[in-house]
């Protein structure tokens, strides 16, 4: 699933492609890609102009004046620019057809991604957005906020970071990375972390998100930005996807277990309970 650095990379590459373009019409080839009524989605967007491409955590927010399209890419969602009359691929589910003849298409092999049309200003009432914590690497993600939030929660730190309720934007890849960097066992209850561990984890989260965004995100499966380019942060990964390989810090082989239903790779020596 694209995490915050990947979605931010998509946002940055989409912005010059669509901002200022006016929608002539919308074609929907898979109705379930829309949360709500597809006909209303098409009717309300006709004649609207893309003004801003925003993002919160893993959600894209397309601003069109008084309306906003909330887009969650989920596992495999991708956007790319083409033309109205380009052949429709079987994995393409929607297009915003612009008055200049170009078209922004949404493709999704797994069909898990969703788009929802809402009034601008109400987007944080959307399911998925309304319960998110503050964004990682944002001014709101202060150390004192993080410390207080961790003290109130007894679930293991891996599950908490994956839940998005305290800090939003991290997924399986970056959670494994920041826990390894901080030498924290993923099964440690959040409220048992020491002050030093919390400080190290807070720094690791901010630094990793910033660096991963700088490298255009991580492509380990199929992630591509809106220009069709892959990310490069996979070349920097230290632990994710490296089960059985030696830890670059101590030489002990990484192990993999399941936590909250997700594969979790860590070092038994460096990340002791």
Swiss-Prot record:
GO terms for biological process: base-excision repair. DNA binds at residues 91, 110, 153. Belongs to the FPG family. Involved in base excision repair of DNA damaged by oxidation or by mutagenic agents. Acts as a DNA glycosylase that recognizes and removes damaged bases. Has a preference for oxidized purines, such as 7,8-dihydro-8-oxoguanine (8-oxoG). Has AP (apurinic/apyrimidinic) lyase activity and introduces nicks in the DNA strand. Cleaves the DNA backbone by beta-delta elimination to generate a single-strand break at the site of the removed base with both 3'- and 5'-phosphates. The keyword DNA repair applies. Binds 1 zinc ion per subunit. Its cofactor is Zn(2+). Its EC number is 3.2.2.23, 4.2.99.18. SUPFAM superfamilies: Glucocorticoid receptor-like (DNA-binding domain) (SSF57716), N-terminal domain of MutM-like DNA repair proteins (SSF81624), S13-like H2TH domain (SSF46946). It catalyses: Hydrolysis of DNA containing ring-opened 7-methylguanine residues, releasing 2,6-diamino-4-hydroxy-5-(N-methyl)formamidopyrimidine; 2'-deoxyribonucleotide-(2'-deoxyribose 5'-phosphate)-2'-deoxyribonucleotide-DNA = a 3'-end 2'-deoxyribonucleotide-(2,3-dehydro-2,3-deoxyribose 5'-phosphate)-DNA + a 5'-end 5'-phospho-2'-deoxyribonucleoside-DNA + H(+). It comes from the Bacteria. This is Formamidopyrimidine-DNA glycosylase. Monomer. Keywords: DNA damage, DNA repair, DNA-binding, Glycosidase, Hydrolase, Lyase, Metal-binding, Multifunctional enzyme, Zinc, Zinc-finger. InterPro entries: DNA_glyclase/AP_lyase_DNA-bd (IPR015886), Formamido-pyr_DNA_Glyclase (IPR020629), FPG_cat (IPR012319), MutM-like_N-ter (IPR035937), Ribosomal_uS13-like_H2TH (IPR010979), Znf_DNA_glyclase/AP_lyase (IPR000214), Znf_FPG/IleRS (IPR010663). The keyword DNA damage applies. Pfam families: Fapy_DNA_glyco, H2TH, zf-FPG_IleRS. The active site is at residues 2-3, 58, 262. One of its GO terms (molecular function) is class I DNA-(apurinic or apyrimidinic site) endonuclease activity. PROSITE patterns: FPG_CAT, ZF_FPG_2.
